[in-house]
């Protein structure tokens, strides 16, 4: 029998309690899917031009998230990075650095960004530490827009905060 997990279909034998109860309140689905993916003997991709969470009005992706959400998302990304097989490391490192930059932009777009100053400072430390690293900020798989956003986060934070607040309207 097959079971669905956040719009993915898995064999029931594949899923474990630990995968599903991973201690996260946010990005728990991402981490559960990653853990299942790592132990799956194979997978099939069905192209669907949509994203169910964004299409659902009650989705958390439409609400401002509490500081814990930032911590949970960083924890999920760090575990994914730490557990990636060698052949996926370059891709996962790009994902990890992009997640740091995205989370910083998520904070900067908020009117109450000062409530997240601890998280933002931690993210900036991670972004700065990886800026010249060929596996992170200089990773060839990292989109230029993310490299530019990282640079703005570090070197022009006020301008970048203004841009985030005026042009990145979700999750304010």
Language model regions located:
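Catalytic-loop motifs flanking and including active-site residues across diverse enzymes
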Residues: 32, 76, 96
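Membrane-interface aromatic/basic loop that binds lipid-linked glycans or pyrophosphate carriers
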Residues: 109-172
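Conserved nucleotide-sugar donor-binding catalytic segment
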Residues: 1-65
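Short charge-dense sequence patches
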Residues: 20-33, 70-73, 161-168
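Residue-level signal for well-ordered alpha-helical scaffold segments within enzymatic catalytic domains
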Residues: 13, 17, 35, 75, ...
